[in-house]
Amino acid sequence: MMRSFVSLISLLLLLSFSSSVLSTKKSSFQKLPVPGNRTGPEAFAFDSTGKGFYTGVTGGKILKYLPKKGYVDFAQITNSSKSSLCDGALGTTNVEKCGRPAGIAFNTKTGDLYVADAALGLHVIPRRGGLAKKIADSVGGKPFLFLDGLDVDPTTGVVYFTSFSSTFGPRDVLKAVATKDSTGKFFKYDPSKKVVTVLMEGLSGSAGCAVSSDGSFVLVGQFTKSNIKRYWIKGSKAGTSEDFTNSVSNPDNIKRIGSTGNFWVASVVNSATGPTNPSAVKVSSAGKVLQTIPLKDKFGDTLVSEVNEYKGQLYIGALFGPFAGILKL
């Protein structure tokens, strides 16, 4: 299984490189190759300064990108994350020692950066960076196994995050998808109480999550089921969930678009041979698809993991790709 997974990652990386020839012809699209032997800038976060972005990559590092300087090291999940063992760790190689940051988001009031590490649990990084502090790797005595998406409520500071599966770890992601595993979960962490709570269970590949701009609900994607659910956190429906949309194919990370009420969703078509036709899909607060931007000419047939709008540009991540992309709107 591991050999086939590594082979798939290698193929996806090759496709990502080959597509770069086409993308350089697009003046509105910019590639920001990840330095060294790291890959997979999966998600993005922006601090209060508004200068550059933060992203997690293979081997357990969090990088900060500065427009005039490029990528610099900001933080690491474990002490080993900066070692030669973790430099060049392909896909899920050595995830138990190195870590693999998946979802990331700032608490804009405190400056703390929260990270859902796929293999090692929920972490927090102080505004100065450095070694991440583990908050939790289990709830109720049950290990998370495979964390994925994360968002922070900008008003309350409550952290919402997902687990792709409670049966399979990151090394067995293909098996989780192939068997249509439905043991994913949706959690919240309240920093004021230091307690993790399970909000939803029985999810099929729960990937991205995003708090709405008015703070009334959280969207939770089900990659395997091509479905997005809405979990209410305020109002008469608080504590209940419902289907939000089935119109987005294999949704990964979900990001709110400022105060507009809309969201960007990273989407692919999961075929028998692997992910294909990546796209950025904008949906309204009512679940209506407003816009679809094809990304195949820029990323090839790879798994685009996040589309995050910031100051008139889309920041696009890829789970296995060698670069982050910026698309001007």
Curated annotation (Swiss-Prot):
Enzyme class: hydrolase
EC number: 3.5.99.13
One GO BP annotation of this record: alkaloid metabolic process
Subcellular location: Vacuole
Keyword Phosphoprotein assigned: no
Range of residues in the leader sequence: 1-23
Keyword DNA-binding recorded: no
Single GO cellular component term: vacuole
UniProt pathway annotation: Alkaloid biosynthesis; 3alpha(S)-strictosidine biosynthesis; 3alpha(S)-strictosidine from secologanin and tryptamine: step 1/1
Positions annotated as glycosylated: 37, 79
Sample GO molecular function, one term: strictosidine synthase activity
Keywords assigned: Alkaloid metabolism, Glycoprotein, Hydrolase, Signal, Vacuole
Domain of life: Eukaryota
Catalytic activity: 3alpha(S)-strictosidine + H2O = secologanin + tryptamine
Pfam family, one: Str_synth
SUPFAM superfamilies: Calcium-dependent phosphotriesterase
Function: Catalyzes the stereospecific condensation of tryptamine with secologanin to form strictosidine, the key intermediate of indole alkaloid biosynthesis.
Family: Belongs to the strictosidine synthase family.
Protein's UniProt name: Protein STRICTOSIDINE SYNTHASE-LIKE 11
Protein species of origin: Arabidopsis thaliana (Mouse-ear cress)
Lineage: Eukaryota, Viridiplantae, Streptophyta, Embryophyta, Tracheophyta
Gene: SSL11
